[in-house]
A protein has these predicted regions:
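Periplasmic polypeptide-binding modules associated with outer-membrane biogenesis and secretion
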Residues: 4-211, 223, 240-257, 418-419
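Gram-negative/organellar outer-membrane beta-barrel architecture
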Residues: 138-142, 158-360, 543-554
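Transmembrane beta-barrel strands of outer-membrane/channel proteins
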Residues: 181, 205-209, 222, 236-242, ...
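Short loop/turn motifs that connect adjacent beta-strands in outer-membrane beta-barrel proteins
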Residues: 229-235, 268-274, 310-318, 354-364, ...
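Outer-membrane beta-barrel translocator domains and adjoining extracellular loop/strand segments
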Residues: 248-258, 285-293, 329-338, 375-383, ...
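Transmembrane beta-barrel strand/turn architecture of Gram-negative outer membrane proteins
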Residues: 299-303, 319-327, 341-350, 366-375, ...
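Surface-exposed extracellular loop regions of Gram-negative outer-membrane beta-barrel proteins
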Residues: 312-327, 364-370, 429-436, 440, ...
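C-terminal transmembrane beta-barrel domains of outer membrane proteins
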Residues: 384-555
Length: 555
């Protein structure tokens, strides 16, 4: 194994601890905005014609003057049928819809048309007249109404504004919201009708073999979330992981255990959230021959604040700022000392973007981390307890990115996932290092095998999905092939650390999923199995085979 530890421990606790325990955010519910249906011309409209001298459009938006003029110019000075007049009104309406003004209607008002006379069209600035929330569970009804209140009566409203408010209304933990738009009673008025279901509690339970051999390979994991119990959109959650032997959890000898709690708390109705979270993990790896057994401790407190800068069906751009305090230390069992001790504070700034493009889905994340201070080399020298990495310092800087892309795939899916990190040439604490392994990189190696200060990974997959169905729901069986390459560097390595690491893997796998309980996969479960072949320049990891298994159920 190649980690930042010179003492031979297979993996530090921070390397098997996820960066967050917060439940993933599900997709928005069905958002349906009816496109303009268009005016219906009267009977025999194609047989009635009139010579038009001029066309006036009342109530038009200045930003649509060019599009409007392009349509009306085709009518001026010509003999046109009544059907052509109605078609022109519909064309102007479609031009407004194309610019996002989907509630605008263009009318042909009652008028007496004479040969050589003018034609009058009227643009009606549509608006949301009211929101019908009777189909929303009562406890969440007031919050949904509050998040949509800014739409009511607003003129010049665009599709992007409507989508943002609807997605915010659906962003209530446990709520699955669908919406439709219908014509209201007032001229230009629109009625927004909402239907929703709400799950007050959600959770997952599963197992996998992502851990290294020194930690027993297998782990059991579970998570539980309480969704908006007070009706303010809050979420309280907890997560736990442990080694495969449950009997050892209570006598503190399990190879790995993780506990964490947190809360997602909305502030206001425009998408601002704060997320305090505490995580504690412990590893008790199998001892290296000739060395005493040791135990690693890692704890972390995070306070995150996030805000959606752009929020539509086509794009979600979110900014997040995080303050984090972390401590990690490794102690030999039976000795009153530490092998290393890291304590530091860090601020992180993150931009995360999700795009839905005609050819597929594209997501990117940029993170900049700046150390704010903590235990450094001076304290290490005074206490005779070193840091996890020689040369590391608590005011570090690092930058990372991740760009997963996935094509739209009714049957054949293609995915490309790239990740990278730079530490600007300086060593990092183990908890801040970059992983070259894992399910989204060189998956022939378990978590914690390769941790570096700077590096990059690239993984490609091709998957063929075979849907199947039954009376209660649907599922998919998806075989896939993959290939991955990773490169990394340890800045200022010790004599026992490789300065440069490369790792590649390729193989085949199978994923199964169901959206409802089945005889094979209960509770809407997911199951995956993968056979991977790996290559590396690290001694002992040159050529390996690995089978990866993961199973999870959600409720």
């Amino acid at each position: 194994m190649a980690t930042g530890l010179a003492n031979g421990q297979a993996v530090a606790p921070s390397r098997v601890t996820p960066s967050t325990l917060a439940p993933p955010v599900g997709p928005a519910g069905a958002i349906t905005v009816t496109s303009p249906a268009g005016l219906t011309p009267p009977q025999n409209a194609s047989n009635l014609s009139v010579a038009i001298s001029n066309v006036t459009v009342e109530g038009g938006f200045p930003e649509l003057e060019a599009e409007t003029e392009a349509v009306t110019a085709k009518l001026r000075g010509r003999r046109v049928t009544v059907a052509e007049i109605f078609a022109a009104a519909n064309a102007i309406e479609q031009a407004y819809a194309a610019r996002g003004y989907v509630l605008v209607r263009v009318a042909v008002p009652p008028q007496q048309l004479k040969n050589g006379g003018p034609l009058r069209l009227v643009v009606v600035d549509g608006f949301v007249e009211s929101v019908d929330v009777k189909g929303v569970p009562e406890r969440q009804r007031a919050l949904v109404q509050a998040r949509l209140a800014s739409l009511i009566g607003k003129r010049h409203v665009t599709l992007a504004e409507i989508e943002r408010r609807l997605i915010l209304a659906s962003d209530i933990p446990g709520l699955v919201l669908s919406s439709t738009i219908a014509r209201g009673t007032a001229p230009g008025g629109t009625l927004l009708v909402l239907e929703a279901t709400w799950s007050p509690i959600a959770g997952t339970f599963g197992f996998d073999n992502r851990l290294p051999p020194s930690l027993g390979n297998w782990e059991l994991n579970g998570a539980l979330a309480v969704n908006s119990p007070l009706g303010y959109g809050e979420q309280l959650y907890g997560a736990a992981s442990t080694g495969y032997n449950l009997g050892k959890v209570f006598d503190a000898t399990t190879p790995m255990q993780l506990l964490g709690v947190g809360a997602v708390l909305p502030l206001g109705v425009d998408g601002l959230k704060i997320n305090p979270e505490y995580t504690n993990s412990v590893t008790r790896p199998a001892p290296v021959p000739g060395a005493p057994p040791d135990v690693g401790y890692y704890q972390r407190f995070d306070l995150r604040a996030s805000y959606p800068l752009i929020l539509t069906r086509a794009q979600a751009l979110t900014f997040q700022a995080t303050y984090e305090w972390a401590q990690e230390h490794l102690s030999p069992i039976g000795f009153d000392t530490d092998i290393y001790d890291d304590q530091y504070n860090v601020a992180r700034l993150q931009l995360e973007d999700h795009l839905r493009l005609p050819y597929g889905l594209l997501a990117g994340t940029l993170v900049f981390s700046q150390g704010l201070g903590g235990r450094g080399e001076t304290q290490a020298a005074l206490t005779n307890v070193p840091l996890s990495q020689q040369g590391a310092f608590p005011t570090f800087s690092k930058s990372g990115s991740m760009q997963p892309g996935r094509s739209l795939c009714p049957t054949i899916c293609r995915a490309l996932i790239g990740q990278a990190q730079t530490s600007f040439g300086h060593p990092l604490f183990i908890a801040e290092q970059f992983s070259l392994d894992g399910s989204q990189a060189a998956s022939a190696y378990p978590l914690g095998t390769f941790s570096v200060d700077e590096g990059a990974t690239l993984r490609g997959e091709i998957q063929r999905a075979y849907p199947f169905g039954w009376t209660q729901g649907r599922g998919t069986i998806a075989p896939y092939i993959f290939g991955a390459a990773s490169q990394g560097w340890i800045d200022d390595p010790t004599a026992v650390q490789p300065g440069h690491i490369n790792a590649e893997s390729f193989g085949v796998g199978l994923r199964l999923g169901a959206d409802t309980p089945t005889p094979v996969l209960p509770l809407g479960a997911t199951f995956s199995i993968e056979l991977a072949r790996g290559f590396s320049n690290v001694v002992g990891e040159g050529q390996v085979y690995r089978g990866n298994v993961a199973f999870a159920v959600k409720f």
